[in-house]
From Swiss-Prot:
Contains one covalently linked phycocyanobilin chromophore. Gene3D superfamilies: Phycocyanins. Light-harvesting photosynthetic bile pigment-protein from the phycobiliprotein complex (phycobilisome, PBS). Phycocyanin is the major phycobiliprotein in the PBS rod. The keyword Manganese does not apply. Disulfide bonds: none annotated. Keywords: Antenna complex, Bile pigment, Chromophore, Electron transport, Membrane, Photosynthesis, Phycobilisome, Thylakoid, Transport. Belongs to the phycobiliprotein family. Transmembrane segments: none annotated. Heterodimer of an alpha and a beta subunit, which further assembles into trimers and the trimers into hexamers. It comes from Synechocystis sp. (strain PCC 6701). (2R,3E)-phycocyanobilin binds at C85. InterPro entries: Globin-like_sf, Phycobilisome_asu/bsu, Phycobilisome_asu/bsu_sf, Phycocyanin_a. It holds the Pfam family Phycobilisome. This is C-phycocyanin alpha subunit.
Length: 163
């Protein structure tokens, strides 16, 4: 079992033969509210994924128009290139939804950051392209309140990792 502040509090209380304190219970309720917001955000992003991906790709093409005219397998000058671009944007969006469900940055840390520099160099991809796509998603996801705060924190984390 992975350690979290909640599992550590339970373990400490159990080893001391006591019930959780009111402070520890408040932390648990706070985590529950955060988890609920994260799950709401993940569901909304998933339900709107195609719209967000398409819009992010168009924002990407507008900011970096050379990507749609430069020939090559790693550019969006062909239908296949545009499909790859959308696939990659979808990958970043999926990582954000995984973080929202997990309640931490682990999915981005393990699946995105770990090899992103090597992948981008190998395939001549610019991280700034995906930063622009993530900025579009953040500005257009349609979330509000705690769900928006949760989603934005992981989107910002991914943007910072790529910057």
């Amino acid at each position: 079992m992975s350690k979290t502040p909640l599992t550590e509090a339970v373990s400490a209380a159990d080893s001391q033969g006591r019930f959780l304190s009111s402070t520890e219970l408040q932390v648990a309720f706070g985590r529950f509210r955060q988890a609920t917001s994260g799950l709401q955000a993940a569901k909304s992003l998933t339900d709107n994924a195609q719209r967000l991906i398409d819009g992010a790709a168009n924002a990407f093409y507008s900011k970096f128009p050379y990507t749609t005219t430069t020939p090559g397998a790693n550019f969006a000058s062909t239908a296949q290139g545009k499909a790859k671009c959308s696939r990659d944007i979808g990958y970043y969006l999926r990582m954000v939804t995984y973080c929202l469900v997990a309640g931490g940055t682990g999915p981005i840390d393990e699946y995105l950051i770990a090899g992103i520099d090597e992948i981008n160099r190998s395939f001549d991809l610019s991280p700034s392209w995906y930063v622009e796509a993530l900025k579009y998603i953040k500005a257009n996801h349609g979330l509000s309140g705690d769900a928006a705060s949760e989603a934005n924190s992981y989107i910002d984390y991914a943007i910072n990792a790529l910057s």
